[in-house]
Each structure stands twice: as structure tokens, then as C-alpha cells.
């Protein structure tokens, strides 16, 4: 991925201006989920690779450290090791699963295979109600285990605070050094008191206040935006989704009428969406300026003959930026006679934390796919980027949007990718295929809304397998139509997702309507893949 060089005026990261819990990722499947759970406790948190040198971690002056799980055995050669310096720095530490075992291993405890593995829901045999992590909790708890090794002897100075049949030392603590650990995964919903355990560590063990709130985020971000943009002007790409709407609202609060929002109609939106966006913008940003740009022919021409998904994302990202550069020139030209006009220097984008992670923006992170507003930017971009949501998860963005007073229809709008239907057509993007997919998508959205499932699912991409034809029977003859794929998922932040269990009667209505009302489609299939291993979007 091409990384754009930071500008000298780029504001300091949030971790530099507020107490931050760093989650050290030892290869956990759900390291991002740990960070989310910490933020749910109103404490700011970020994820860093466990391979980060201890000195570099401590330079950031973390308020606390949480050590994630991981697939390795601490005693095997080449396994990730915990630097004892992190345990000697006086920073509160909580180890989870592998992180728990790494604490024991580093401080002289014993980690071994006991012959009893624990996977899934497990009942704690004993809990010390006087311990920091379990104070004022039910003594009977069900937790989510996933381990073959176990701590059989705690390090010197540690009190054992919980145990199970397969883990004689399932939790321990050293109050004096403020080091704690549990063998299970409190971050997952299957651990009945998991969030309470994390909150006990954060608020009691580490002594952190609950200061990470939507109102606090707004105040901090508005100040940072003013610091970054100064007296210059900005334009914001408005898509109609919650991300760009909240980003625009934050920037508008910071710089007022020096922000112009631009909506690029690239022809890849869903049925009736452009008109909805114009109306919603008026409700959310009354009096603000919105420039509508019709670039449908330009995008469709650029995508002609292109089938590779990464190539499509790159093309859409580049055309998007070029369209903005033209809009910038027009805005500047209009204000030439205004003596108070200043340079239009910044491009506001609704980039989120998961976008950055999936695009390889984190140190040591693998590039899963290029997001059009992160890794899809051209090298010679003429703007400086302002990304006020870059450190937020989706649920936090919604909370900020609600706090800002945005319409509910925007705040709770289901996610829709920037490249639009262009990455939901598997194959070349043509006008005929877009029209076909729009109709199928409209049917799905209408039926899910009628069934009251809007808030129960995260999103439901409808995918057209444009390069595939299947044999069908309609009336008295054979048909050779395209399949469409329904991809309903449940999620909290898009980092992980499960396929949504849509009621059979709803699926039946959707299938019947699509195959009867959409010419060229004769088969509807359901994608039942979780994330991981599959991403939410097919491309």
C-alpha cells in the first residue's frame, strides 16, 4: 500500500492526548475486539503488534497494557515472548489466554500441557470474590476457553483467583505490581461476566476513569481539526453513509462555512440513493453547501473491460480523487473575487479504524484489501487528508453522530462501500448489469425493512455473479440467467462478522420476488460464511 507522507500540521494521534490502553497482539483472532471492549468501558485503546520493542511501547506512556491471546505455546522455540521489561515498568498489565501464560512464563511460573484441553464454554470451579477482577460478582461463572496448555504454577508473589478442571491456575493477580491475568477470553460474549472483568481491571486494577465518551470525542476532534486545517478550506466527499456524514458534521463544527461538501454520483449507487442523499443532507446540514457532481459516464468508461477487483477499487479511488480535484478547481474559481477566500487544501474522508487495519495501515499488519479511501489513493494526490474518524470503530461513529444531532436515518444507515455496486458485480461493470443489480438490491432492502430486520443485521450486500450463468426453468422453457448472492451479516464493528440467520419466510419472499421481477436472474443463493475467513464484501 502506498502510504501518504504525514503533513507537519497533522494533529497528534489520540493516544498522545489522552490515557491509552495498548493491546499487544500476539496473533489473536480478535485483538481488535479487545480494543472495542475497552472502549465500551469508556477508556481509549489501540492495538499494537506484540513484536513492538518494549522501549517503543513504554515511550508512548500507556495507561495500561493488555496482552492478547495467540495460537503459539510459550515454551516452544520461536514463540512470541513477552519482554520482562514491560512487567517491571510499573504499568498495569492484564494477560488474556496466551498473554496470561506469557506472564507466568516470563516471571518463573510453570506452563505445561496438562492433558486436558478446554475449548468453548467452561464453568469456573472456584472464584476469589475478594480479588480485584472478580469483586462483587457471582461465584459461578461460565467463561470461553480456547487452550491446550495451562498454567500449573503461578509465579512467586501471585495469588490464584480462579481455577477450572483443565486449568488449575485459571486466573491470578499480584496487586502490589498491578499485574493480572485470566486463561479465558473475557472479550467474547460467551464469557458471562467478561465485560465486568475487563472493567474491574481498567477502573479498579489500573485506576482509569471512564473518560472516553461521544461528547469528549467531539470536543477533542473539533480542536484537532481546527489545529490541522487552520484558516484553510476543505471539501468533503459525501456518500450518504454515516461515516462521511459524521466526518462532515465534525469538520463543519470546527471550520463552519469553509467546508464545502461534494457528492460524486459515480453511477454505482443503489436505486434512488442519490436523491435520498440530497434530501438527507439538507436535513442534517441545513444551510450548508452541497455540490452535486454527475460523473456516471466517466466512471463507467474507466471501468470498461475491467474485471480484477483490486483494479476496480484502484480505478474508482483514482477517479474519485480526480473528480474532487475538478470540484476543488471550480470552488476556487467561484471564490476568486472573494477577498476573504483562502486556499482549498484539505480533503475530508470518513476513514475508520477497521479501514486502516484492513489496508495494512497498522505496523506489521497484512494488507487484506485496499479500501478506496485508504489504500486506493493515487500517489500524486493534490490534497492533504483530514480523517477525523480514523481512530474510531463504526459503533463509536454512530454514537458521535447521534450526539451531533444527525437524523436517525443517517446514523443507523447500513454500511455501503465507497466503490458501491462496482465491487458487488463479479465481472465487468456495465450499465445493464448495474440496472439488474439495483433492482435485486432494492427488493432485498424492501423485504428486510418490512420484516423489521434493519437494526438486527449489520448489512446485506447483494452480489451479482455477472460472469456466471446457470440453467433454470421458467414457464415452459429453459433459462440461462445470472445468480445473485445474498450476504446478510451480523457484526459490531466489521472487524469480525457472522452470517445472519434470516427467517425462512423472508428468504422465500426475497427469492420469489427477485426471480419473478428481475429479468436475467434465475437463481438466488445465500452466503453462510463468517468473517474470518471471508470478508463481508466479495471484492
From Swiss-Prot:
Ligase is among the record's keywords: yes
Catalytic activity: XMP + L-glutamine + ATP + H2O = GMP + L-glutamate + AMP + diphosphate + 2 H(+)
GO terms under cellular component: cytosol
EC number(s) per entry: 6.3.5.2
Boundaries of every Glutamine amidotransferase type-1 domain copy: 20-211
Pfam families: GATase (PF00117), GMP_synt_C (PF00958), NAD_synthase (PF02540)
Residues at the active site: 97 (nucleophile), 185, 187
Domain GMPS ATP-PPase: 212-413
Source taxon at top rank: Bacteria
InterPro entries per UniProt: Class_I_gatase-like, GATASE, GMP_synth_C, GMP_synth_GATase, GMP_synthase, GMPS_ATP_PPase_dom, NAD/GMP_synthase, Rossmann-like_a/b/a_fold
Enzyme class: ligase
Pathway the protein takes part in: Purine metabolism; GMP biosynthesis; GMP from XMP (L-Gln route): step 1/1
Positions with a binding annotation for ATP: 239-245
Keyword field: ATP-binding, Glutamine amidotransferase, GMP biosynthesis, Ligase, Nucleotide-binding, Purine biosynthesis
Transmembrane domains' residue ranges: none
Entry keyword Translocase: no
Molecular function per GO: ATP binding; GMP synthase activity
NCBIfam families per UniProt: guaA_Cterm, guaA_Nterm, PRK00074.1
Role: Catalyzes the synthesis of GMP from XMP.
Subunit organization: Homodimer.
Family annotation (HAMAP family): GMP_synthase
Full protein name: GMP synthase [glutamine-hydrolyzing]
The gene coding this protein: guaA
Amino acid at each position: 500500500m502506498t502510504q501518504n507522507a504525514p503533513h507537519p500540521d497533522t494533529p497528534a494521534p489520540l493516544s498522545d492526548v489522552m490515557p491509552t490502553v495498548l493491546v499487544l497482539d500476539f496473533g489473536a483472532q480478535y485483538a481488535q475486539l479487545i480494543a472495542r471492549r475497552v472502549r465500551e468501558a469508556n477508556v481509549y485503546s489501540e492495538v499494537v503488534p506484540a513484536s513492538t520493542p518494549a522501549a517503543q511501547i513504554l515511550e508512548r506512556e500507556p495507561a495500561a497494557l493488555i496482552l492478547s491471546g495467540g495460537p503459539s505455546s510459550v515454551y516452544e522455540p520461536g514463540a512470541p515472548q513477552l519482554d520482562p521489561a514491560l512487567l517491571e515498568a510499573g504499568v498495569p498489565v492484564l494477560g488474556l489466554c496466551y498473554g496470561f501464560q506469557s506472564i507466568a512464563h516470563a516471571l518463573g511460573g510453570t506452563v505445561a500441557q496438562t492433558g486436558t484441553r478446554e475449548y468453548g464454554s467452561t464453568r469456573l470451579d472456584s472464584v476469589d470474590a475478594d480479588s480485584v477482577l472478580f469483586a462483587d460478582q457471582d461465584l459461578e461463572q461460565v467463561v470461553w476457553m480456547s487452550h491446550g496448555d495451562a498454567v500449573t504454577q503461578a509465579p512467586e508473589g501471585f495469588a490464584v483467583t480462579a481455577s477450572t478442571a483443565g486449568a488449575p491456575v485459571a486466573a491470578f493477580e499480584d496487586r502490589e505490581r498491578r499485574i493480572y491475568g485470566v486463561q479465558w477470553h473475557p472479550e467474547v460474549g460467551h464469557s458471562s461476566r467478561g465485560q465486568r472483568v475487563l472493567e474491574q481491571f481498567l477502573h479498579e486494577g489500573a485506576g482509569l476513569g471512564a473518560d472516553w465518551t461521544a461528547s469528549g470525542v467531539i470536543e477533542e476532534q473539533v480542536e484537532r481539526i481546527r489545529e490541522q486545517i487552520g484558516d484553510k478550506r476543505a471539501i468533503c466527499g459525501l456518500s450518504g453513509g454515516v461515516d462521511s456524514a459524521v466526518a462532515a458534521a465534525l469538520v463543519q463544527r470546527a471550520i463552519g462555512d469553509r467546508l464545502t461538501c461534494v457528492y460524486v454520483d459515480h453511477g454505482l449507487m443503489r436505486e434512488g440513493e442519490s436523491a435520498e442523499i440530497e434530501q438527507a443532507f439538507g436535513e442534517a446540514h441545513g444551510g450548508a453547501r452541497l455540490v452535486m457532481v454527475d460523473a456516471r459516464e466517466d466512471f463507467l468508461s474507466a471501468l470498461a473491460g475491467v474485471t480484477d477487483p483490486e483494479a476496480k477499487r484502484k480505478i474508482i479511488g483514482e477517479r474519485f480523487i480526480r473528480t474532487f480535484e475538478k470540484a476543488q478547481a471550480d470552488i476556487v474559481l467561484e471564490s476568486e473575487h472573494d477577498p476573504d477566500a483562502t486556499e482549498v487544501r484539505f480533503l475530508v474522508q470518513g476513514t475508520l479504524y477497521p479501514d486502516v487495519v484492513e489496508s495494512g495501515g497498522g505496523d506489521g499488519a497484512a494488507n487484506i484489501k485496499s479500501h478506496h479511501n485508504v489504500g486506493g489513493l493515487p500517489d500524486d494526490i493534490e490534497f492533504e487528508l483530514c480523517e477525523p474518524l480514523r481512530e474510531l470503530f463504526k459503533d463509536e461513529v454512530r454514537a458521535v453522530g447521534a450526539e451531533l444531532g444527525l437524523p436517525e436515518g443517517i446514523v443507523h444507515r447500513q454500511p455501503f462501500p465507497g466503490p458501491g455496486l462496482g465491487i458487488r458485480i463479479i465481472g465487468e461493470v456495465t450499465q445493464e448489469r448495474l440496472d439488474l443489480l439495483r433492482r435485486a438490491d432494492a427488493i432485498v432492502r424492501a423485504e428486510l425493512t418490512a420484516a423489521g430486520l434493519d437494526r438486527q443485521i449489520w448489512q446485506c450486500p447483494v452480489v451479482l455473479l455477472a460472469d456466471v450463468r446457470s440453467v433454470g426453468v421458467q414457464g415452459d422453457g429453459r433459462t440461462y440467467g445470472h445468480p445473485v448472492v445474498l450476504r446478510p451479516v451480523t457484526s459490531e464493528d466489521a472487524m469480525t462478522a457472522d452470517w445472519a440467520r434470516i427467517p425462512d419466510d423472508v428468504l422465500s419472499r426475497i427469492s420469489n420476488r427477485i426471480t419473478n421481477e428481475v429479468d436475467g436472474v434465475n437463481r438466488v443463493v445465500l452466503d453462510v460464511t463468517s468473517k474470518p475467513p471471508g470478508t463481508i464484501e466479495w471484492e
